[in-house]
Regions:
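Extracellular beta-strand scaffolds
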Residues: 85-88, 103-107, 113-115, 139-143, ...
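Solvent-exposed adhesion/ligand-recognition segments of exported proteins
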Residues: 36-303
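N-terminal secretory signal peptides that target proteins for export/translocation
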Residues: 1-18
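Bacterial N-terminal signal peptides
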Residues: 22-34
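N-terminal intrinsically disordered, low-complexity tails enriched in polar/charged
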Residues: 3-7, 38-42, 473-474
């Protein structure tokens, strides 16, 4: 059910009387589709899953006439459905879009049990407010979110699930600790939300970004077949899981179980499923990016206050991108490229577990840091590869005033031609073939331990503040 309130411009009475019914109807139709959020209940769903939707345009005093060219804020209030015994309010829609307009657009999820200033209590809330508000789109219409979405009343987790895709350009969320955007189909377990079945759909964060940071203790989940970030994403903890996955959650805000769907060798899979463009960025306390059947490409900024964790079954490219966090883990079954990129950990002065000595861990089939930078100011660096590590014209550096600063590198081939591996403490390199032509492997105050079968170091420098140990493998 929908209620529409419209402020039409004042017109001369005689002229208005000449308007026929059809013309008036067309004007109303134009206003209803262009001024408001296009949020429409799924009338084919059971009644108890159909939310009540109400629209309102606020009068703007500076407007001579309220019309599409001059108007106040546009509000859409959703009286969410009655929550079940688990506190889950399941709402189904034919369309869920918050349109871009001249005013300040807002969608309110009404979780009020009683009236409050400016709002009427939700009659669907009989004996309790919702803990989780699930908004499921059942049609083939993608969701476009261009404004502010807020829970009024009791704080609740908000989920928008649309297999046809979600486009966010300046969307904001408030009064909710946990937001989930997904192109998966919700799954259930004993009346509770069990997770999402993701086989299609794209989430796009456009230039005006996504904001969800009422405070640092909030969670943002992005679950989709593919993800494009072309603007800033800001939240507390961010978890992205891309590709075809059966995602299990228990409970919400708790652990997440990812089970890939289908054959990972499928030739039809998407090559890049997470793409952070040059104009894109992710800023959060913790950032987890998991790609089960495609690659991760970052040309923008991934910046986490506590941890950044990137995992891909295909490849990870940080070419000319930036990853910045006190603790960084980058793992892939394929290649990892940091060509011209920066991977930086700043832990000096921060308190962390004494056993958590590694600030940066990188492991892939091949790791390429050509003209790139891997830097930490307190803690160890570990770079490992199944086949090769290339640091040609690159820098791997660990400089610490206090605490650990070891650098460990292990692969069949390690190439440091014209490169720098520098630390104040220990360096350990284990390789079959080690090349350091015109390169520098330097420990300012401690040991350099080299294990290799062949060594090429024309015009190269290998220096240990205490000593250099070399072991030639049989």
């Amino acid at each position: 059910m929908s209620r529409l309130t419209i402020y039409l411009p004042e017109v001369h009475k005689e002229f208005f009387n000449k308007l026929n019914f059809i013309y008036v109807f067309l004007i109303l139709l134009f206003f209803s589709h262009s001024l408001f959020a296009s949020i429409v209940s799924d009338t084919t769903a059971p009644k108890y899953q159909q939310p009540d939707i109400h629209h309102y345009i606020e009068e703007r005093k500076t407007c001579k006439a309220q019309n599409v060219h001059c108007q106040g804020a546009k509000f859409t209030t959703i009286n969410i459905t009655t929550p079940n015994e688990k506190g889950l309010s399941h709402n189904k829609y034919d369309e869920f879009t918050l349109k871009l307009g001249r005013g300040h657009n807002k969608v309110f999820f009404n979780n009020l049990m009683i009236d409050s200033p400016g709002f009427i209590g939700n009659p669907n809330l009989v004996d309790k407010a919702a803990m989780v508000i699930l908004n499921e789109v059942t049609s083939n219409k993608k969701s476009e979110l261009h404004g502010h979405l807020a829970v009024i009343g009791h704080k609740a987790d908000v989920i928008i699930a649309n297999p046809s895709g979600i486009y966010c350009n300046g969307c904001q969320f408030s009064n909710t600790d946990h937001v989930t955007l997904t192109t998966g189909i919700p799954t259930f377990r004993s009346g509770d939300l069990g997770g999402y079945y993701v086989t299609q759909g794209k989430i796009i964060i456009s230039s005006n970004g996504l904001k969800h940071n009422d405070n640092s203790n909030v969670f943002l989940d992005l679950f989709s077949a593919s993800l494009i970030i072309n603007g800033e994403v800001r939240s507390g903890d961010v978890l992205t899981a891309t590709g075809n996955n059966d995602i299990g959650i228990m409970p919400i805000k708790g652990s997440v179980d990812l089970k890939p769907i289908g054959d990972l060798s499928n030739s039809n899979k998407i090559d890049v499923v997470v793409d952070v463009t040059k104009l894109g960025g992710m800023y959060a306390n913790k950032i987890f990016i998991y790609s089960k059947d495609g690659g991760i490409h970052n040309k923008g900024i991934i910046e986490a206050e506590t941890m950044a964790d990137l995992v891909s079954a295909s490849f990870i490219k940080n070419n000319f991108g930036k990853i910045d966090s006190p603790k960084i883990r980058i793992r892939s079954s394929g290649d990892i490229d940091n060509i011209g990129g920066r991977i930086k950990s700043r832990r000096q002065g921060l308190s962390y577990n004494a056993n958590d000595k590694f600030g940066i861990r990188i492991f892939g089939r091949n790791v390429n840091n050509s003209a790139g930078s891997i830097y930490i100011n307190s803690g160890h660096i570990s770079v490992g590869a199944v086949d090769s590590i290339t640091n040609r014209d690159g820098i791997i550096k660990s400089i610490a005033v206090t605490g650990g600063a070891d650098i460990k590198m292990k692969a069949k081939k390690v190439n440091n031609d014209n490169g720098y591996v520098i630390t104040t403490q220990n360096i350990e390199i284990d390789a079959t073939d080690l090349a350091n032509n015109r390169g520098k492997i330097v420990s300012a105050f401690s040991h350099v331990d080299l294990h290799y079968k062949t060594l090429s170091t024309e015009d190269g420098i290998i220096h240990g503040g205490i000593e250099v140990k070399s072991e030639v493998k049989p």
